[in-house]
Amino acid sequence: MAILTNTRSCVTVLAFLSLLFSFSIHAQNTIAPFQTWTDVVRTKPYAESQGVYDNVMTVRRWILTRSEHCTERNRHVLFDMRGNFLDFIEDASDSLQTQQKLNQTRQGMAQQGRVHAWVEGNANTIGYPFAIRCHQPYVDLSLAVSRYLGEHPDGRLSGNWNGISVGTPKNQASLHDVLQTVYKRRVQQKRISLPSNLLPDLAGMLIIESGGVREAKSKANARGILQLTPTALKDCGVPANKHLHRIAQVDCALWLFERNHRMLQPVFLARFGHLPEEKREQVYRLLLIQAYHGGPGRVRSLLTDEEFSKPAAYFAAHHEQFSAGDIAFGMVFHNLGRNRLGFASLYYTADIRIAQQMLASRNIANLASLQQSHLLTSL
């Protein structure tokens, strides 16, 4: 009888311990979500910005070129604070179910230890890990590059603007020709002091902003090939009946770049003047792109504001550990969610650089084709 009683006691104790262990495991696997995605951003060390530029570029390249994990349009890709790709999901039948699927995936990643935290997203709130849709209905990068180079009829033009003449009706110019002509003319007139190494950035903007479409208009009322607002065009002295004039748009964009350059260069050099020349130049170019997109005042605050400039101060002191892209992106990444800074600024900058790379590849291919043609002709 005593033996039976002892046996029952042991079984009871073992069952209790097993239940306790089960609760312990469940507690370890159930990770409560952060309240907001900005909590995740604020708790991550600046040092974890290493690699963010290349990682974001990779994800955006998949989207713009419809490649890798974005060959199917009805997908979302998820990535972490460093921009590392984590996974993708197939979209559900509607946006609400897709959001639920994203949140389940986020929670699962946290429970598996793939991310240190998760945040539930909804129609009004960004979730974490971050997610972006593969389908970008207004993007056709290859066609936009063709327009820029004048390979597509929509990209060819002739006309006059404020003392500048480009092309003729019988020998029309490309948008590339327009950019080069306007830049050279304004430099000769000493109206701008922009270094010529900024021209590839403007070329990227001509490709990305509107796809080279003259009549493009955004929901925010930005218009034309460089998506300039009526206010910006007025500041440039462009009359209302010339807002879509492509030469005028390029001229105005150069003026805006010049204005931003004059505003930002002194404070940039005060913060990053000690960087090696090539790295310093690359960081500055990326910040100028962000200034064109979000306004120079916002970028200036990243360099001078007591709170917003903390990431810049860290990267300036430890620049050897980061690429130029990591520094420029890190300054924005660690300020996301405040001062009206959002992912659009990072995506825009990445897209400009991707457009530049595609343009360079197209130019190389065209040159090789031309050389091959000359070789065959000479045989």
Question: What is the role of each PLM region?
Answer:
Residues 216-235:
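Short, surface-exposed glycine/acidic/tryptophan-bearing loops
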